[in-house]
Amino acid sequence: MRICNLLNRNRIKHWITQIFALALLVAATSAQDGQPPVAAPVRPPLPPLPAPMALPKPGPTNDAPYVPQPILPGGVVVPLYPPGSPLLKMERIREAEQYNMSQAVPGRISSIVNIHNPSIEVHTVDGGLNTGAAIILAAGGGHNTLNVGGESADFVPFFYNYGVNTIILRNRLRRDGYSPKIDAVNDALQAIRLVRAYAREWRIDPNKIGIMGFSAGAELSSPAAILFDEFDRTNSAPADPLSGVSSRPDFVGIIYPGPTPFVRGASPPIPRNAPPAFITCAGAGDRVHAIWANEYFAAMLQAGIPNVEMHIYGNGRHPGDTLSDGSRMTSGLTDRNAIPFGTWQYRFIDWFRDLGFLQKPGIETKASKEITAFLSQPPPGSGRGGGGNRGATNSQANPVGAAPKAATPANP
């Protein structure tokens, strides 16, 4: 024990000696330079940061119907219905939308509620890049909010890179007293008609207009694929400025969908010119939405509709789900920690390019040609073959590849 204590004392003395020697060396060096030891400089404080600029905000309210403001710079906002439309609630038309802003990113609108004057916000592409294709984005949110941040606004620059024009749909919500199956679906179909009516002004190919819905938004895009005839017949009054303009989408995107028209074995009639569809969802981690996705796919496959593609990923969760660490699953374009489900948007681009939607405007797409070929086949039950198309009807409100009837644009 005595030996250990002696060794420890010797070590301490050695360290003290070394420190003292180093201090003498520093002092000697400073004396040789004729300068006192230099202290660390004291910097002045940084100037305060400026406040964020050009933050989006709801439009003013007055005696006129509320006019929505753009979510992103440069957006052209057009109300879906003219003032006085019977499809609007006149007692609420003047109410302002309410924005839920991101707490971390200044100016980022995460979601919107209190939508009573539904609208589209159009973002076009420069002429040299423009393919003429246009995608209407229907965000999710459980019909309680409209998650326009991750499931609409983020896609504008993404699709711009591929020459695709982007339209953000602000549809009405169940939380504000509207029916998702009636009012919101009407908003989606009206949006398709409105974009088609203004196609020339926005340099959009009228035969390359589709809709992509996310979660609750897919409860708009999936019925839009089969209900366009009924909507056009119902809204064909001569006084309607969009009468004669087809609401048929040229393609649909069904992304981690809510219930489709084929939920629990339902079998509504499927028009034989139903559009091609791209469907994606996580699998076991989002089982119920994957089942709904598969119901839509199976119905279209049974009907023989061309170019319906589905990707069900083994790993992934539904956007908004709470994880074990307390974080929430993100939506839209996020790469989801580099799992394959985080690349679904590139699989959509592969499908979209394969069907000819990324060609220059005015060139008939492969999708259109293959639907035309399908329509030339005998319908099911005709006694001339063509079996396996259970549920398909002969509806052709807007023959594929034909330009829609011209209409006087609405006066928003």
Residue map of PLM features:
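C-terminal catalytic histidine-bearing segment of alpha/beta-hydrolase fold enzymes
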Residues: 301-412
